[in-house]
Structures are given as C-alpha cells and as structure tokens.
Amino acid sequence: MKNELEKVMAGRDMTENEMNMLANSIIQGELSDVQIASFLVALKMKGESASELTGLARALQKAAISIPTNLTNAMDNCGTGGDRSFSFNISTTAAFVLAAGGVNMAKHGNRSITSKSGSADVLEALGINLYLPAEKLAQVFDKVGLVFLFAQNLHPAMKYFTPVRRQLEIPTIMNLTGPLINPIPLDTQLLGTSRPDLLELTANVLKGLGRKRALVITGEGGMDEATPFGLNHYALLENGEVTLHKFRAADVGMSEVALNDIRGGEAPENSEILKNVLENCSSAFLETTVLNAGLGFYANGKVDSIKSGIELAREVIAQGAALEKLHELQAEQIG
C-alpha cells in the first residue's frame, strides 16, 4: 500500500495490474478505513487513469455475485452520481421506458451517497425488493426484460468502501467504477458522468471491458445525465472507435426546461414523479426522461439518431408500455 500511495501522490499512474492487486487487498480486508480513504483522496487529487479504472473494475467485477440469466444483449444506464443537482431519478425512470421499448435493461444502482434519493431508494419506495437472491433476479430479468440489481447486495466487496465514501462525502474513483461493474455482462451501455474531462477515457475503458457500443454523457453544469437545457457533451463508442460530440435540446427537436423544474426530493416524492412520467403527465420531468431514454435507445443501437430515440421514447410512454413495465417489475421483483 505504501509504495502505491507514494506513486499516486507523486502524480504517477498505477498500472492495471498494480490497481488490481491493491483492490484485491482491500477486498480481502487487509487495509484500514484510513488507508482506503487516503488512497481514494490521493487518486482524486492526481486524476484517475484508464488503467486504474480498468484494474479496479476488473477486481470488483470478479468479486461480484454472478446472475445466471439466459438473456443476452443486456444494457445498463447507470450513472456515476455525485453531481449534487438534486434532480429526480432520471436514469431509473428512463430504464422503464427503455425496457418497454425492447431493450434488456439490467439496471444497476445503489442507495444515495450525495443526493436525497438513489435508484435503490426510489425503487424500494415503489415496492421493489432489493434483496432477492441471484437466481431469482435472473428469473425476473428473463421474464420481464428488466431487473434492478442492488449493488450493496451483489458486491460484497463494497462493504470495505461504503463507510469511507459516506464519511468523505465527495465523488471518488468509486463513483466512476460503479457503473462499470454490473453483475450481468453488458453488450451496450449509457453511462452518465459528472466529469466531462473523463468522457473519452471512460468510453475507452468501456471498450476495454468488452462493450460493443456505448455512450458516455455529461450534461450542462456537470450533471451525470443528458439535460434539456444548456450544452451536453458525449463520447460515443461505435465500431471500436470513440468519437466526441455535443448537442443542445434544440438540436434534437426539444424545447429547453430549467434545472429547478427537474429537481426531486426524498424517495417517496421521487417515486410519485416516476409514476407521473410513466403515466405521460406533461412536465419537465417527462421531457428530461424522454431525452435520456432517447439517448439510451441510440446508445443501444435501436435507432440511428438521438432524435429518433426521443420519438420512440414518447411513443412507448404514450402507449402505456412503460407504465406496464413498472407494473410487471412490481409483480415479479417481490417477496
């Protein structure tokens, strides 16, 4: 640990193997909270590298509980969190739209770290069981084409990181790693990050981890979602190549809304917002959801443009299919 910490503090990147070995030491309970915290802060101050992200992701992925699903072509739209926008649960709401549109959604998430309501919090408020065993989760996914995978339940190794992260109260490499370690192997991914400086790097990490197609997005003001206001930047992984792009709401046929109009609250309030969106109630919440679901359809390769993805998202919601997908999950991910 000392050598690795000194290396990072000197501004030098760890190799993938060095990070993998250090992560395994943490996972095996060999380091104290103070050592883990000092390491996370040092990495943040230096700036995380692709090799460090990949090494940590591979170690945590290997330690995760496997989900024995029969479905292929799985996708996730989990974000890094940590943007402190206090928005409603955008990616969680969009996941129902994506699943209703035919995308096999393995929604990976956690409780709130820096916001009022994480994806796990809002889904628990909707009656979703966070603690089903892996075999049952696989059955839910195979039947519904959507499942919520509670990170704390499926990543036993996280118990060594979570107390430290809560005490630090700042985004760390763990925020960046969380979306990379879905227990179900992913073919495609929409990943929101609050770090626009890491768009290209993260897309290349996803490439190294085997994603066939992926889109990494940062919204206006560093939101880890696409925003229907201001400028969005994204990196697209397509055909093995990473390209950088940007767009505004008007570029994809949408009107702008204000950040204040998409702020959420605690889990009960956010669960009502989610249901209202899936019921097609006109609002800034709905507009933000169709934008992010549209981006997800594009990331998945189901449509050939973001604008076409937005149109598909509106259609899925208007037909009631997204609300029905919520009801399906509520009926299956229980007990």
From Swiss-Prot:
What are the entry keywords? Amino-acid biosynthesis, Aromatic amino acid biosynthesis, Glycosyltransferase, Magnesium, Metal-binding, Transferase, Tryptophan biosynthesis
**Which Pfam families does the UniProt entry name for this protein?**
Glycos_trans_3N, Glycos_transf_3
The UniProt record gives the binding positions of anthranilate 1 as: 79, 110
Q: Which reaction does it catalyse?
A: N-(5-phospho-beta-D-ribosyl)anthranilate + diphosphate = 5-phospho-alpha-D-ribose 1-diphosphate + anthranilate
Chain sites annotated for binding 5-phospho-alpha-D-ribose 1-diphosphate = 79, 82-83, 87, 89-92, 107-115, 119
Q: Quote the SUPFAM superfamilies the UniProt record gives.
A: Nucleoside phosphorylase/phosphoribosyltransferase catalytic domain, Nucleoside phosphorylase/phosphoribosyltransferase N-terminal domain
Please, one GO biological process term?
L-tryptophan biosynthetic process
Q: Does the keyword Metal-binding apply?
A: yes
Reported EC number(s) for this entry are: 2.4.2.18
A GO MF term: anthranilate phosphoribosyltransferase activity
Cofactor(s) named in the record = Mg(2+)
Biological or metabolic pathway of the protein = Amino-acid biosynthesis; L-tryptophan biosynthesis; L-tryptophan from chorismate: step 2/5
Which family does the entry's similarity section mention? Belongs to the anthranilate phosphoribosyltransferase family.
Q: How does it assemble?
A: Homodimer.
| Protein name in the entry | Anthranilate phosphoribosyltransferase
- Source organism per entry reads Lactococcus lactis subsp. cremoris (strain SK11)
